[in-house]
């Protein structure tokens, strides 16, 4: 049992920027999918062109590490920080080995909420029952959900890697990652349900008009109310 609350993604973003005094000028953050693009959009601070590299077009899960290699090749003078959720990491992680073969150093922060936390929250916000997004809600064998050690996996590909539990531990690990000359992976568990405020804007996600679930009908009423407040 943990003796501390799990951090949310926004708190991890803050820790990444605090881990280097010149982060707004020297870092390039790379991201693509899940909760992180929205959190980075609100929280990441950059004072130099190209310091914010997020694949918004299709939110391609798995783009992050491969994209980070390209960014580092284009900007070898900058510190490249790849921020990726556990879901995206599982979809395409082999480019860690490629980064080592090419001698392209990345700092990779894996935020492990044990599933697709962003989609889980959207599902709940639309009145749906938890289904197949978090590992705990998926079909499971007799041994339960997989206990994936992302740091051990990254080390098996040749990277330096470690697991941390708290924000202070994360900041210390990031200092070690920044000092390293090879790809370094830092993994931290995050809360799949907690996030920061939306930033003052409504995200329009349609809700079914007809449902037997009272939660869906309540979500539909809120959706229609928000639609009425939109500009014509």
Locations of regions flagged by a protein language model:
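Thiamine diphosphate
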Residues: 38-39, 43-232
